[in-house]
Amino acid sequence: MKRIRDLWVRTNLIKKIGIGVVIGLLLGILLPDVTAIGILGQLFVGALKAIAPLLVFALVAQAISHQRSGQQTNMTLIIVLYLLGTFLAALVAVIANYLFPLTLTLNTPVNTELSPPQGIVQVFQTLLLKLVDNPINALATANYIGVLAWALIFGLALKSVPSDFKHLIKTAADVTSQIVVWIINVAPIGIMGLVFSTVSENGISILSDYALLILVLVGTMLFVALVVNPLLAFVLTHQNPYPLVFRCLKDSGLTAFFTRSSAANIPVNLQLCEDLGLSQATYLVSIPLGAMINMGGAAITINVLTLAAVNTFGIQIDFLTALLLSVVAAISACGASGVTGGSLLLIPVACSLFGISSDLAMQVVGVGFIVGVIQDSCETALNSSTDVLFTAIAENAFWKQKKA
């Protein structure tokens, strides 16, 4: 028994997660009625979601309070990459529609408790109001826009106070970081529970019923992750981007795939940035911000399903109109974190461009919920891993420019 325990302790975390995936898959197929196993996954995701807002607040406030005047953070380039990457992902989804046109079988039951936003203005109005949320409420409800805003304000205010107060916030940051390490160490057990729940509740029939739609969604996301993003990285750094790309997908994308939550993956991304030796002053802001606005996967989902609806209803559109859809999808996707239901509930905004009624658009959303088990996992993996990738290549590009 001691030998098994020692072997487990020495095993790499990613290998442990792989073992957890296999065990969860087997249990989901062989013992689907033992629902208690799924609670392990809920506890894991719940723990990450619970600690993440406090971690972000403490780390960002601590970083800002200790930041020296004129210190380089590369945030401008990172934000440009976030927005450009989201737009390019939306554009790739348009091209995928021309190569593999889809149609949908509608009359799908829809969760009527969810209501889509009335337009892009409403999406951004919601985001702006989140900026001025009560700081305690922002922490309690995981409103990361509000958490970031108040952490920046507290950090700036702490610049002018005695060092004892700064030491207090640093202690809080260290304590929350240690708690995150403990939680991540039980990731294999949590992911085993998540895989079990997915398999036992949905089975594998979903793969055959909506195979082509799933293939187009996943294939487009893989193309962005393995071609478009590396191309952006190469243009900026003039170095082989794939070692970094695969590191981000392995260490960030894998956990994000199973947690299906960019917010829950923030602690994982912060740890990865530290392991990569990136500037703390940069990644403590860019990673939580990326979880809010870096939404390439969401833009792909919006465009693929919207254009599938357009094909289904026989609406003819030219490429310029599809290009306009990419802009709308990119802007909408940046607000996906502020909408209940995420990217799927922003599909009616895009459908409205083509005169598709809200009732019909919500049927398209219903199809999205059916494939959501796979779509949401891949979407989150792409979004979250790209947060680290863009942060890293922005810093590499900066130092390359300084040396030149």
UniProtKB/Swiss-Prot annotation:
Keywords: Amino-acid transport, Cell membrane, Membrane, Symport, Transmembrane, Transmembrane helix, Transport. The lineage of its organism: Bacteria, Bacillati, Bacillota, Bacilli, Lactobacillales. The gene is sstT. InterPro entries: Na-dicarboxylate_symporter (IPR001991), Na:dicarbo_symporter_sf (IPR036458), Ser_Thr_transp_SstT (IPR023025). This is Serine/threonine transporter SstT. It is a multi-pass membrane protein. NCBIfam families: PRK13628.1 (NF010151). It holds the Pfam family SDF. The keyword DNA-binding does not apply.
